[in-house]
């Protein structure tokens, strides 16, 4: 993937606040197993809700392969908290307001589109911080969780 993170690349550690405002690091999640990081453009929009709810609905399948799910968007901590409460998410939503982490992963759009400046992409990351799979689909919201599970052997 040009200008971003691709399969086989090693991901740098990062820290962002979760929906409670607590700072969370990628390395913290990786200590417990592989991590599925999914980027979504904007909380509480139709597509992002469908994508995020599918990750929620597959909690048992992700647990069976020892993987954790982490959602990231440019929404504020407060908006992430409301999104999580409304849909009962059982995984953290990280707030990347300045788009720094999105840019590091290569999912930040070139055009300034506000909250929609982030591409909908998913990265499956092994405990060695190496990317095992990348999923990119703007239209098939279920593809992200489904393909991530396949990459993890689920």
Over which residues does each language-model region extend?
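Chalcogenol-based redox active-site neighborhoods
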Residues: 1-154
